[in-house]
């Protein structure tokens, strides 16, 4: 480790920023889950994204001026927003139907997908130890989902697609992270995300809902209606919390090395389980607990293995 990195590396502070940021994300997700029971999901996400975009632009202009709005590589930045749209919209779609802890446990496969995509897309060398961790992790997901059995719920598999889309974002970050400011990336991503929500909602409102549509997808075809003042306040609070959590996780990776911070991202599963129990009365089943622990263990092993090989 170089002297400059050593001076910047503040592991305890980085871990604290990460853990509290993930708590913020978990609380925000519970707010979105609550709002989606009373309003169409796309309407909830549209309002939240508009507020987040406004906050990011305001902070960016205040700290850096108009130059923060100019991206050096607009196409990868827009692709990042498209992936975020599919990742987060599908995740919140699942949250509207399944417990927070169940969705989080499957979503924790994202680091496994990152390892897989690093080998396939970036042609990075992945050794037998990490391939083994990936295989064990996805086996744990199969145990959690129980496909082919009476316990299987199709909507429970949606976070797996969400994790795959989200895992592509770090791949793009590795390509553009050295040339783009974090706020620029956030602004472009949120703007693209918001634009796609508006476009999708417009198309859905022009096309009649198909008959016998899956109940989970049927929620996308609900007609929009105005928020009450208290719920608008809840949406604003969720947006502020999301923005703070985003800044927190960015700060965590800025002041501590990746291999120190990444394992603590799994604290989201703990927060999600606790919040799901306290606010929704959800108690995770044995399959979710065992499978979730296996996925977390495999993800942490991959990170520690990469650190040992001096890859991060």
Region locations from a protein language model:
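C-terminal-most transmembrane helix of multi-pass membrane proteins
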Residues: 2, 267-312
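Hydrophobic/small/kink-forming positions within alpha-helical transmembrane segments
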Residues: 22-27, 57, 81, 85-89, ...
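Transmembrane alpha-helical segments that form core, pore/gating elements
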Residues: 33, 42, 56, 151-211, ...
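Hydrophobic/aromatic residues within transmembrane alpha-helices
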Residues: 35, 44, 94, 100, ...
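Helix-helix packing/entry segments at the starts of transmembrane helices
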Residues: 47, 104-109, 177-192, 243-277
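C-terminal transmembrane-helix exit sites in multi-pass transporters
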Residues: 110-132, 270-289
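Hydrophobic transmembrane alpha-helices of multi-pass small-molecule transport proteins
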Residues: 129-146, 162, 287-306
């Amino acid at each position: 480790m170089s002297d400059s990195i050593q001076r910047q590396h503040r592991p305890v502070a980085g871990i604290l920023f990460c853990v509290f940021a993930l708590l913020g994300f978990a609380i925000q997700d519970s707010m979105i889950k609550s709002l989606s029971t009373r309003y169409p999901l796309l309407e909830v996400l549209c309002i939240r994204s508009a507020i987040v975009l406004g906050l990011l632009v305001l902070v960016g202009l205040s700290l850096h001026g108009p130059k923060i709005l100019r991206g050096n590589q607009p196409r990868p930045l827009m692709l990042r927003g498209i992936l975020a749209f599919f990742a987060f919209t599908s995740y919140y779609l699942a949250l509207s139907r399944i417990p927070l802890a169940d969705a989080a446990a499957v979503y924790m496969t994202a680091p496994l997908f990152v390892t897989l995509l690093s080998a396939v897309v970036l042609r990075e060398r992945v050794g037998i130890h990490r391939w083994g961790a990936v295989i064990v992790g996805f086996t744990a997901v199969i145990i959690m989902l129980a496909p082919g059995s009476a316990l299987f719920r199709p909507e429970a598999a949606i976070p797996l697609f969400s994790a795959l889309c989200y895992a592509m974002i770090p791949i793009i970050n590795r390509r553009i992270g050295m040339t783009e400011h974090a706020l620029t990336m956030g602004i472009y991503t949120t703007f693209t995300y918001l634009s796609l929500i508006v476009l999708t909602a417009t198309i859905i409102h022009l096309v009649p809902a198909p008959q016998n549509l899956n109940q989970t997808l049927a929620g996308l075809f609900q007609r929009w209606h105005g928020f009450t003042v208290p719920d608008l306040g809840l949406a604003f609070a969720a947006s502020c919390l999301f923005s703070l959590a985003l800044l927190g996780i960015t700060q965590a990776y800025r002041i501590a090395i990746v291999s120190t911070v990444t394992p603590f991202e799994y604290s989201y599963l703990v927060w999600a389980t606790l919040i799901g129990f306290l606010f929704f009365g959800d108690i995770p089943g044995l399959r979710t607990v065992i499978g979730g622990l296996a996925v977390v263990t495999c993800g942490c092993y991959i990170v520690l293995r990469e650190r040992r090989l001096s890859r991060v």
